């Protein structure tokens, strides 16, 4: 296996594991915790701390970063609103359902695997810039590592909340690598 092929495979296996851990948290979350704040801080509006919203936030940014386009050129698929990226005032009219979020995540898992497995040297080295990069463009490849860390960070937050409320076991266990097949994840 060439280093290029090895790198793409390793990147997918670890990114896929982060996505799978995130999905495990969505599946394991009881209805009683769907609107539970993940952390005590109170941004405005407070709904932005709820389990479902943190999940939505992570998915929208996962999609944007996999696309590698500027924020102003991105729109999430229906039924999701753009507000997460371009406005602090726009919230969905009601919390997204677990089914909607899992369907979006399933499509993003496929997109992620495709991006990781087909990334060329030219694509990997293409420079992208986002407001948080403070005027310092980064490579698309580095963006994907950032994206993976962002996804895993939110998977950990959601899993921690579940654990604090007595949800334990296989549903929130560590995923070491994504499986070889796409399966049901």
Give names to the regions the model predicted.
Residues 15, 19-22, 26, 105, ...:
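Hydrophobic alpha-helical core bundles mediating ligand binding, dimerization, or RNAP-core interactions
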């Amino acid at each position: 296996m060439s280093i290029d092929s090895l790198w793409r495979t390793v990147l997918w296996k670890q990114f896929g594991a982060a996505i799978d851990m995130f999905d495990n948290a969505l599946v394991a979350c009881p209805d009683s915790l769907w609107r539970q704040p993940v952390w005590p801080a109170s941004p405005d509006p407070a709904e932005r701390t709820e389990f479902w919203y943190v999940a939505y936030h992570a998915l929208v940014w996962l999609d944007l970063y996999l696309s590698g386009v500027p924020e102003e050129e991105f729109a999430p698929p229906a039924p999701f609103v753009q507000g997460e990226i371009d406005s602090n005032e726009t919230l969905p009219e009601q919390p997204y359902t677990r089914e909607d979020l899992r369907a979006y995540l399933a499509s993003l898992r496929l997109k992620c695997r495709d991006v990781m497995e087909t990334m060329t040297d030219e694509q990997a080295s293409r420079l992208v810039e986002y407001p948080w990069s403070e005027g310092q463009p980064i490579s698309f490849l580095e963006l994907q590592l950032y994206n993976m860390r962002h996804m895993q960070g939110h998977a950990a937050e959601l899993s921690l909340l579940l654990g604090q409320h007595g949800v334990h076991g296989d549903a929130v266990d560590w995923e070491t690598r994504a499986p070889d097949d796409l399966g049901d994840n």
